[in-house]
């Protein structure tokens, strides 16, 4: 894929981990296909995940009543964000594809990655209320989550004790990535890695590399288009009445989050529509 650039964000502390092996496999596979690959190994970088006044290098607008969202937006516009944030934003700006490699921790992303999102995805850079979801700043970019779990796949099924993996993925894939415009590709889910034998691990790595050969051509996951909603505060950003009427008699809702009180479409956050 000549001319394409990928950013791999790794959130695991150990170089001997399977997450690190997945990151290495991804980098090798993409480079083999002609991609330029940049990495953010958050633990190796000792990335600071805590938002604070220190993220702004210039003069604060209201130091007596510090409000991070407002101050960080102003700092972004004026070029006064801390250098570590700016460096990550530049990586994002240059990337066509972003891969997030991490172990599922407490049904979400590791704290260091959550902090990366909070500090790097600054308002006006990553989102605005005038331009969000499929109109967001990153709408020309694609993203994929590559996740390992401790539990088995059955534990994250409809009948499993942990509940439906689609529901777990929604806040990350819709609430963070698609909110900023990303076209989100099917997640790479590696279940129960701690109980997976060596030969099976090799097969997983090879399958991951094979997938990455043509990942740019994959169909993204489905999210309800922003055109289905009245995008203003007066209307409450609610789904348009005519859309609600049209969907009323359908068996399934539109997505995990927009289920409209009906059954959730099967694997809405795991498989793309065919």
Swiss-Prot record:
Consequence of changing residue 129 to F/V: Abolishes the interaction with TP73
Consequence recorded when altering residue 105 to Y: Decreases the catalytic efficiency toward menadione. Increases the affinity toward NADH. Increases the catalytic afficiency toward nitrobenzene substrate. Has no effect on the affinity toward NADH
GO biological processes: cell redox homeostasis; cellular response to oxidative stress; innate immune response; negative regulation of ferroptosis; negative regulation of protein catabolic process; nitric oxide biosynthetic process; protein catabolic process; protein polyubiquitination
Obligatory cofactor(s): FAD
Pfam hit, one: Flavodoxin_2
Keyword presence, ATP-binding: no
The keyword Aminoacyl-tRNA synthetase belongs to this UniProt entry's keyword annotation: no
GO molecular function, one term: RNA binding
Chain residue numbers at which the record places covalent cross-link Glycyl lysine isopeptide (Lys-Gly) (interchain with G-Cter in SUMO2): 250-251
Residues noted as binding substrate in the record, renumbered to the chain: 126-128
Subunit structure: Homodimer. Interacts with PDLIM4 isoform 2; this interaction stabilizes PDLIM4 isoform 2 in response to oxidative stress and protects it from ubiquitin-independent degradation by the core 20S proteasome. Interacts with TP73 (via SAM domain); this interaction is NADH-dependent, stabilizes TP73 in response to oxidative stress and protects it from ubiquitin-independent degradation by the 20S proteasome. Interacts with TP53; this interaction is NADH-dependent, stabilizes TP53 in response to oxidative stress and protects it from ubiquitin-independent degradation by the 20S proteasome.
Identification of the protein by name: NAD(P)H dehydrogenase [quinone] 1
Species whose genome carries this gene: Homo sapiens (Human)
Top-level taxonomy: Eukaryota, Metazoa, Chordata, Craniata, Vertebrata
